[in-house]
Amino acid sequence: MALAYDPLFITSDKSLSAFDVASSPPQPMNLTQDELKRIAAYKAVEFVESGMVLGLGTGSTAKHAVDRIGELLRQGKLENIVGIPTSKKTQEQALSLGIPLSDLDAHPVIDLSIDGADEVDPFLNLVKGRGGSLLREKMIEGASKKFVVIVDDSKMVKHIGGSKLALPVEIVPFCWKFTAEKLRSLLEGYGCEANLRLGEKGKAFVTDNGNYIVDMHVEEDMGDLGAVSDAILRLPGVVEHGMFLDMASTVIIAGELGVKIKNKH
């Protein structure tokens, strides 16, 4: 069932002191994390218009957005939508909902992508890919005119790596230990640990592209993220990393006090 949210609780980054459009302080809505994710996702789908080519994200938050798009198509409120899925899982979901699908070869420019994130810093830089789909996500969202990110407020951090959770790096399987050690050594100054991601039965997790993922855990602020990004990508064996720098157009943040919208300036 669709969740309602009070428009008085929606703010923009013109005033980041939060929820100052309400005449009195809003009361906490006491919602679960999944309900907050759904609220953010439904708000993001308001950006969708008939005739658009859409990048369809992957993960627990993006799933709600894909569900909503399918619902609006069934209701006839959206028409002539084409979806570009960022993973096999999202592809299966979209097909089950009757969303027409295509790919970047047929649609190299995407009107709008909607996806979740694992971290969002004050400059709207992101960590993504803890679900394992970072390469396709970055290809599709990087080809988008507008990229809307949907999160609950637990994903907001002071700096990338601030959650102490993983920064994923996709690598080729060949001599993965060699590549993982190079990554660890590269970020050693930030207190880095590098661990191969494991999947079922303790075997290496394999991405949709047939690659492995090394999860990087850093203890300190990495500072110049652009320089760190370049250094990671220069390592032979690295395919892509999960830092999405200067890519988000808008971030929609759902919390117990309502929904907040931040736009890239």
UniProtKB/Swiss-Prot annotation:
Disruption phenotype: Retarded growth and slight chlorosis due to decreased chloroplast photosynthetic capacity. Reduced accumulation of starch in leaves. Late flowering when grown under short-day conditions.
EC top class named in words: isomerase
Phosphoserine, modified sites: 96
GO molecular function, one term: ribose-5-phosphate isomerase activity
Example GO BP: cell death
EC number(s) from the headed UniProt entry: 5.3.1.6
Pathway: Carbohydrate degradation; pentose phosphate pathway; D-ribose 5-phosphate from D-ribulose 5-phosphate (non-oxidative stage): step 1/1
Repeat listed as a keyword: no
Entry's Gene Ontology cellular component terms: cytoplasm
Chain positions found as N-acetylalanine: 2
Annotated compartments: Cytoplasm
Family: Belongs to the ribose 5-phosphate isomerase family.
UniProt function note: Catalyzes the reversible conversion of ribose-5-phosphate to ribulose 5-phosphate.
Protein's name according to its UniProt entry: Probable ribose-5-phosphate isomerase 2
Organism expressing this protein natively: Arabidopsis thaliana
Lineage: Eukaryota, Viridiplantae, Streptophyta, Embryophyta, Tracheophyta
